[in-house]
């Protein structure tokens, strides 16, 4: 039954769930950002130099609507002899109406206290940015350049991943979901996390 399936889903890595139960193994073929380019980080979150939060918001919570997504990234130095790298700190996705989105966004903001907040200037992102500014939170509006489609934006950030500069906390389900979505792009079912990543 559905409850049992939900339990199985919660216990399996996202990749196994997609392959076994959804009959939809995430293929690496054609992937712009490959799974093996991500580095896992064990232990507690390192000292961060800068925290960035990126928002891709949808129009509504209708079944047919896209998801709203928030990812949080930290800039840090993994090892003394290395330059700066990025760490995926958190990822939240859901179908929210505006009041819910505002609460989720504020919770995430208060928890991570990012220095930079980037919100795509579309859909519920516009009023959300206004609300944040009203509270004294500085927001950067993200406007995709004309002629720069999603594909181009992902291609632009791919070298950062390929050069081994992106980390994720080991054994975190949200990290698995983001990695899987990236590996499935551009053929995956969702790309909301991918959108937030290219903005950050």
Residue ranges: model-predicted function:
Residues 186-200:
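Charge-patterned, long linear interaction tracts outside catalytic cores
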């Amino acid at each position: 039954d559905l409850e049992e399936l939900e339990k199985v889903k919660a216990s399996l890595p996202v990749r196994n769930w997609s392959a076994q139960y959804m009959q939809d193994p995430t293929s690496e073929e054609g992937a712009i950002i490959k799974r093996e380019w991500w580095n896992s980080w064990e232990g507690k979150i390192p000292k961060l130099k800068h925290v960035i939060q990126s928002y891709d918001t949808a129009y509504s919570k209708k079944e047919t609507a896209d998801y709203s997504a928030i990812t949080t990234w930290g800039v840090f130095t993994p090892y003394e002899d290395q330059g700066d790298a990025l760490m995926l700190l958190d990822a939240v996705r859901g179908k929210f109406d505006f009041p819910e989105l505002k609460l989720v966004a504020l919770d995430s903001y208060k928890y991570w206290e990012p220095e930079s907040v980037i919100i795509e200037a579309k859909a519920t992102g516009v009023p959300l940015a206004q609300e944040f500014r009203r509270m004294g939170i500085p927001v950067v509006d993200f406007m995709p350049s004309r002629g720069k489609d999603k594909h181009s934006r992902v291609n632009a950030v791919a070298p950062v991943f390929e050069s081994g500069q992106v980390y994720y906390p080991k054994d975190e389900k949200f990290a698995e979901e983001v990695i899987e979505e990236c590996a499935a792009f551009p053929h995956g079912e969702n790309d909301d996390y991918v959108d937030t990543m290219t903005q950050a």
